Amino acid sequence: MTDARSEIEEVVHRETRAWDERDVETLLSIFHPDMVWPWPPTPHDHDPMTWVFVMGRFDRERWGAVWRELFATHDLVHNHRTIRRIEVTPDGDGALAIVDVDTLWRTPAGMESHWKGRACKVYAKVDGAWQMTMHTGLLEYGL
């Protein structure tokens, strides 16, 4: 059996490569159909009472359209991601990855969208493959 931590690390790296390569299909393949993605209004809003759902529950067509639009209108300046922790459930059927993200997008007009902070990515092993079921929005921790 392959080490679950190594498998999760591979999924995180696959997601990073998908952003780097603007590969919508690979991004979409990572998500479980029940994926939800709560997002804090700012990277400093640690209290989940303020969080919102920008994209709602996973919808392949809708989420794909959002990312195709992003890729068509923005250049990727940099995409730095560092895995800080991977934890696997005792039964090996669930996991989380704590990832520090620093991704900068820029439009041709110079407008920037900076994704910076720490994420908790939650995965379940479904039919032998790891799929993301939840991902917190990026939070700054002053580290």
Protein language model regions, located:
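Short beta-strand edge/turn micro-motifs at domain boundaries
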Residues: L96, W115-L143
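A solvent-exposed, acidic/Ser-Thr-rich amphipathic alpha-helical stretch
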Residues: R5-S6, V24-D91
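Residue-level recognition of conserved beta-strand positions in structured domain cores
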Residues: W39, V99-D100, M134
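Short, cysteine-centered beta-strand-loop-beta hairpins and adjacent loop/turn segments enriched
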Residues: L104-S113
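Short solvent-exposed loop/turn micro-motifs enriched in small/polar/acidic residues
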Residues: E10, N79-R81, W115-K116
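Hydrophobic/aromatic beta-strand elements that line small-molecule binding cavities or substrate pockets
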Residues: R81-E87, V101-T103, R118-A124, G137
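Short, low-complexity N-terminal intrinsically disordered segments enriched in polar/charged residues
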Residues: M1-W37, G110, L143
